[in-house]
Amino acid sequence: MIISKRKINVRTIRNLHNGEGLTLRHGRPVTYKTGWQVATHGVECTTPEEVAKLIRTAEYAEACGIWLDNDIYYVDHSIRVATKHAAVKLGRECNQLSIFGWGRKSDNALEWL
């Protein structure tokens, strides 16, 4: 696990481009070498300020993902699991459209359910 030393801020969120995202742990960008990231539930936000406020709440502070799509910021509470099987099962239980594989090449990291 690699965790950035710096917490993100509104500027970091504002600098996301369409289709880009971040995974956060305690407000800091994080990457893993293995495992799968699965969202359990989430919220849509329209401004970077809304996102910054949300990720400081107890519900989203520990682990969450942010991504920008067509000017909407999606903020999801997420869980990292070890296997694809566990990720698919949890993703389907939580009505998710996809899961994210950490150990995969960036162009194949997203698996649609």
Provide a role label for each language-model segment:
Residues 1-113:
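Conserved, structured core segments of small domains
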